[in-house]
């Protein structure tokens, strides 16, 4: 290999070796990088750099495919410079190939194809990519990680929600097999309540033997019902209003699968703050009721609540509680007490108004405790459709009575007759053990003893009651034993008479004295 020396011509450093040409091109636009260019243009440092390269290439017989240099001095001089690659036409190196650094190299290395040194945001070609001033190895690792993250983010969209399935319960409704959708713990109750009304009206029908249904299927059936509605009046203004309502309803339908935001007013069972969600109920002719009303016999509460909605009342309570006016503070406390006393979102006055407002045989949606239920009025009584998934196999359990605010109604079948959920006790439960029987008998005897003492006018005491109960229990257990002894020993009756009659004891002592006598 012939030795060659690097020459400096007009700011260009050219080094020649066998089959290798190094070309460091000066950028005409780099006016602010004179310190770096002067450092690179230093003849002694450049000569040392090229000589080091030749020494590295000397052992190679074939033209090397890569060229490296440990430009420690240059790296110190250009530590603040950023390395940017030019386009392929400007950065082509004669008879050279790209260099990929190995991980074992400890010194910073980079490709010698074409280098441009520039300060931050200066001298960067408008179409050239921006690269780091660190080693190519570090830069490659960073870029690979960033690319992997970008690809992973692009290929990992928002996780699709799995379609929800709901079990279908078949009941006999007005002598017809009718499907009812059951609800899990966190199911979309507005959608289920509306769809159950459409099923009970036979507006929607499922194929026979259907066991599960998806949310998409429910939404499709509901959309068909909404689109099949026709305007009741042919007036031009009414048609335009109907078309607008249809458009709003179709936009609201997806919300039914996640829940509706309704804002009740405490003035009537049908009073809700108007929201686009209410349009669906209006179009499908489904009444929406609630029973959260203020008792008119409480004028202070009526004055504090007024005609406000729930959200407005909460804001009023917060504002009045921090007021400096004592009357406002008192009014806020009264309103807060009303919400606390009706935490079940149902008052007795509201229940009475609900029973009066609902029509006989009318299917409606009842809102309570942030839950939507299917309700019907039958012979003057209100019933809620049982949609709990736990009663899926209980075909006879269809309705639950709504007659108090506590929510402990009675279960009824499809004909509104009282029924009880079937319970299949186990064999152990069907046959209680002897210990359980004894405990039950003791409890029964204790109650009998209590009643006897009350009849005699004695004050019951815990100790005497317990003793009396034990005595009764003991006598009851001794009865079969005494009967057996009477059959085996006829004199057993006399021994029992000794414990109860003093005369019997006297007669027995007389007999004993007679037996002690002996005849000579």
Swiss-Prot record:
Biased composition (Polar residues): 43-54, 93-112, 132-146
InterPro entries membership: MINDY (IPR007518), MINDY_domain (IPR033979)
Region annotated Ubiquitin-binding domain (UBD), chain positions: 441-479
Residue ranges of the region described as Disordered: 1-155, 422-441, 467-520
Pfam families: MINDY_DUB
Catalytic function, reaction form: Thiol-dependent hydrolysis of ester, thioester, amide, peptide and isopeptide bonds formed by the C-terminal Gly of ubiquitin (a 76-residue protein attached to proteins as an intracellular targeting signal)
Compositional bias per record (Basic and acidic residues), positions renumbered to this chain: 26-37, 511-520
Originating species: Danio rerio (Zebrafish)
Leading EC class: hydrolase
UniProt EC number: 3.4.19.12
Residues annotated as the enzyme's active site: 189 (nucleophile), 371 (proton acceptor)
GO biological process: proteolysis
Family, per entry: Belongs to the MINDY deubiquitinase family. FAM63 subfamily.
Record's protein name: Ubiquitin carboxyl-terminal hydrolase MINDY-1
Alphabetical UniProt keywords: Hydrolase, Protease, Thiol protease, Ubl conjugation pathway
One GO MF term: cysteine-type deubiquitinase activity
Cited function: Hydrolase that can specifically remove 'Lys-48'-linked conjugated ubiquitin from proteins. May play a regulatory role at the level of protein turnover.
Positions marked as site (Ubiquitin-binding): 465, 468-469, 472
Keyword Ion transport: no
Ranges annotated as biased composition (Low complexity): 77-86, 469-498
Signal peptide positions on this chain: none
